[in-house]
């Protein structure tokens, strides 16, 4: 076998969900399992964390429908809400909670009354989705008069994961003010806010990336936050070549040896979901020893420096997991672990442990 493999660890998912619940205190924990459970598998992630959380969060109705069709009865929040009357009716039929983030959704609800649980989303400064505070208050009044009163207020922090965060306090005050005026529960905390701002926990938190063993911060590791690795990506060495000083490696000859080196060829590439934009110097580990990527990532292969290492064809190369922190790989690539998890393709073997 080629040996390119993704290992999903159920015990780590459970640990991380319990860690979120511990931090949340009395607040409900809605585990975000959108985007195929951040690349871990929608059903796998949901079923593994069922006993540790109060509900689940998805982005779109089809994800929620899949969960319901597989017997998951926990409350499910659909973060993008509904796109048309048909989806609105389906949300009611499936007993889903839907986010109302725009005035056109308010009008659609008023024109198509449905017994659906509504969370009004307040734009408290992120300027992506959400009603302005005055719009949210007006929408709540109109929906209540029509017999479909919202059950909660939610918002989303823009900068809770940043070292110098000057926005979250203001956002919390704005969203909290709307919730207080409407006398409704508030949900605003993502992973970063759950870990960092106890005041923001309110009545419901919506952790995502921390559940999958990754830190939302660049100054604290997942292990330091009490999280465990749930996603390990590995491959095998399929060749080792001697390269002389002045010789280049890979497409575009982007890396040139300054002295004689031993270059390992690894059976993984962007066709498997390894980031094509990973630069030379990105960490990998051979038999538990960290070394680096050299040259450009190909569709099916990468090349790494194994000079001085005890390395043979067939040996395992960890791309991220126990030795190589996924967040270090993400930083090297100028991206975030969320993208790395989500872009793994169907080609690597999946192992559930």
UniProtKB/Swiss-Prot annotation:
InterPro entries registered for this protein in UniProt: Ala_racemase (IPR000821), Ala_racemase/Decarboxylase_C (IPR009006), Ala_racemase_C (IPR011079), Ala_racemase_N (IPR001608), PLP-binding_barrel (IPR029066)
Pfam family, one: Ala_racemase_C
Biological pathway: Amino-acid biosynthesis; D-alanine biosynthesis; D-alanine from L-alanine: step 1/1
Broadest EC class assigned to this enzyme: isomerase
Positions that bind substrate: 128, 299
Example GO BP: D-alanine biosynthetic process
Catalytic activity: L-alanine = D-alanine
Keyword annotations: Isomerase, Pyridoxal phosphate
GO cellular component: cytosol
GO molecular function list: alanine racemase activity; pyridoxal phosphate binding
Modified residues (N6-(pyridoxal phosphate)lysine): 34
Residues annotated as catalytic: 34, 251
Annotated EC: 5.1.1.1
Necessary cofactors: pyridoxal 5'-phosphate
NCBIfam families on file: alr
Family per record: Belongs to the alanine racemase family.
Function: Catalyzes the interconversion of L-alanine and D-alanine. May also act on other amino acids.
UniProt name for this protein: Alanine racemase
Gene (UniProt): alr
